[in-house]
Amino acid sequence: MAKATGRYNLVPPKKDMEKGVIFSDLCNFLITQTLQGWKVYWAGIEFDVSQKGMALLTRLKTNDFAPAWAMTRNLFPHLFQNPNSVIQSPIWALRVILAAGLQDQLLDHSLVEPLTGALGLISDWLLTTTSTHFNLRTRSVKDQLSLRMLSLIRSNILQFINKLDALHVVNYNGLLSSIEIGTSTHTIIITRTNMGFLVEVQEPDKSAMNSKRPGPVKFSLLHESAFKPFTRVPQSGMQSLIMEFNSLLAI
């Protein structure tokens, strides 16, 4: 008797990659207040964003700090001693990091349209606004973005987070501690510190670094706990202790 089989069926896509990743996930930045800070949902990823370290950032900026923190303040004079620098929220820092992750994919030059155009627009939205929803009006772009493309974006963002986690805390050994991404309108610098990631957005010419006439810069801190669920190798208590001793940074 003839028997129905699925012998030549196409292999189904990996569910773990494409689970819940739809286009609207990229265009919605959902924020929920919690006791410790916020929960943020974007691109099928949930982040727990803490306010840890923000009080210290403010004290360094307002010159209300302990003498032991002087090195931190002097290491980043364009942030803490610049009248044109402005402290932002940790939510802003997360948006900038995600925008940088999208820009990192664009710099790879291996993506094709319409993915490149969509990523550029979404990156600009995250970087330059505080709105929770982005309306991509080009219907054809939405129609051409497959689940595979969307899951690729999510996967690459998680890879970028691991790239940040692999950075060394600022120290005397000259090890790589920052990632810098330049666009035609901004320069993004993300630096690893004891607490997490010091995020800054400057003008393209990095005029904030000009000691005589420092230009504008926005900055904030994203505590490392926001990325811990997504990093490959969790740090042991001893590793964290060694990291702290390797750096005299207050943050």
From Swiss-Prot:
InterPro entries: Filo_VP24 (IPR009433). It is a peripheral membrane protein. One of its GO terms (biological process) is symbiont-mediated suppression of host innate immune response. It is found in: Virion membrane; Host cell membrane; Host endomembrane system. The keyword Membrane applies. GO terms for cellular component: host cell endomembrane system; host cell plasma membrane; membrane; virion membrane. One of its GO terms (molecular function) is structural molecule activity. The keyword Translocase does not apply. Disulfide bonds: none annotated. Keywords: Host cell membrane, Host membrane, Host-virus interaction, Inhibition of host innate immune response by virus, Interferon antiviral system evasion, Membrane, Viral immunoevasion, Virion. Belongs to the filoviridae membrane-associated protein VP24 family. Prevents the establishment of cellular antiviral state by blocking the interferon-alpha/beta (IFN-alpha/beta) and IFN-gamma signaling pathways. Blocks the IFN-induced nuclear accumulation of host phosphorylated STAT1, by interacting with the STAT1-binding region of host importin alpha-1/KPNA1 protein, thereby inhibiting the latter. Without the activity of this protein, activated STAT1 would not enter the nucleus and be unable to activate IFN-induced genes. Plays a role in assembly of viral nucleocapsid and virion budding. Interacts with host importins KPNA1, KPNA5 and KPNA6. Interacts with host STAT1. This is Membrane-associated protein VP24. It comes from Reston ebolavirus (strain Philippines-96).
